[in-house]
Amino acid sequence: ANIGEIDILINNAGYLVKNNFDKLSHEDLLKSYQINVIGIMQAVQVIIPKMNPNGSHIVNISSMGGFQGSVKFPGLTAYSTSKAALCSFTELFAEEYKDSGIKMNCLCLGAVQTEMLEEAFPGFEAPHSPEEMASFIYTFATTQGDFMNGKIIPVSQSTP
């Protein structure tokens, strides 16, 4: 299918394996990084030529687990480090493409009541539903690209 210029791209991919560091398999690490970082980077490579050069915005969805200085949880090494890598990618891309008209920012989400959260933290009740967070992300993506680039932004009332 032929698509026109893209104004907004939201990268929301997540894979979480909960296991102590010494128990993580090679496959656990590969899958975490493939989904949480490499797949996103490859998607961006494909999309760059289609992005609107007169102002477009890429929003990466990371996690408070990958936000420097945040509370860390045992068993989330693969997840949190891969989400931290996504934050670093955001900063590097923003610098490399700063004159292109394409902006990239990263939202580090705290707890949202998803299946992934329930599996990682059974019984934990998050302050936001997926629908509420989707509304926030949409508003951010459509209104903030003109104001910031390369920013890593915590979006959390609680952690996890």
Place the predicted regions along the sequence by residue.
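Residue(s) in the substrate-gating loop at a strand-loop-helix junction
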Residues: S63
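Conserved NAD(P)H cofactor-binding loop of Rossmann-fold oxidoreductase domains
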Residues: N12-V17
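A short, exposed helix-loop element centered on a Lys and neighboring polar residues
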Residues: V44-Q45, E91
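Substrate-binding pocket helix/loop in short-chain dehydrogenase/reductase
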Residues: N20-F21, D28-L30
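Active-site helix of classical SDR
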Residues: V44, Y79-S82
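C-terminal helical subdomain
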Residues: C106-L107, P122-P160
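Active-site-adjacent segment of SDR/Rossmann-fold oxidoreductases
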Residues: M51, V71, E91-I102
